[in-house]
């Protein structure tokens, strides 16, 4: 259950980041509490929490929201969510997509606005 620099790189790139090998090593060293050169899940969560608190995370969240919000109306609909998840290789049923929307949809309007999106992203 440990994450290597290679695996961390894959995750970061899927989130739109492009870290160098040295940056990945630095990130691992930063949170590698037991010094074994890999990070376990608690260390990984610690790292992600730190990355999200960085000043540029606001811009990254806006960028991610724009990727989901295809028609740029300020909301992520079930169809838009399904489209992005399919592009990421996730085959979801309508029920699963609706469930994801319900979990994030604080005001109950059936879609996800930016504030709701940020809450979900920061809660992980």
Curated annotation (Swiss-Prot):
SUPFAM superfamilies: EF-hand (SSF47473). The keyword Protease does not apply. Ca(2+) 3 binds at residues 69, 71, 73, 80. One of its GO terms (cellular component) is cytoplasm. The modification N6,N6,N6-trimethyllysine is found at residue 91. Ca(2+) 1 binds at residues 2, 7. Disulfide bonds: none annotated. InterPro entries: CALM/Myosin/TropC-like (IPR050230), EF-hand-dom_pair (IPR011992), EF_Hand_1_Ca_BS (IPR018247), EF_hand_dom (IPR002048). The keyword Transmembrane helix does not apply. Ca(2+) 4 binds at residues 105, 107, 109, 111, 116. Pfam families: EF-hand_7, EF-hand_8. Ca(2+) 2 binds at residues 32, 34, 36, 38, 43. Expression of PCM4 very low in stolon tips, stems, roots, leaves and tubers. PCM2 not detected in the organs tested. Residues 1-18, 19-54, 56-91, 92-124 form the EF-hand domain. Belongs to the calmodulin family. Calmodulin mediates the control of a large number of enzymes, ion channels and other proteins by Ca(2+). Among the enzymes to be stimulated by the calmodulin-Ca(2+) complex are a number of protein kinases and phosphatases. This protein may have four calcium-binding sites. This is Calmodulin-2/4. It comes from Solanum tuberosum (Potato).
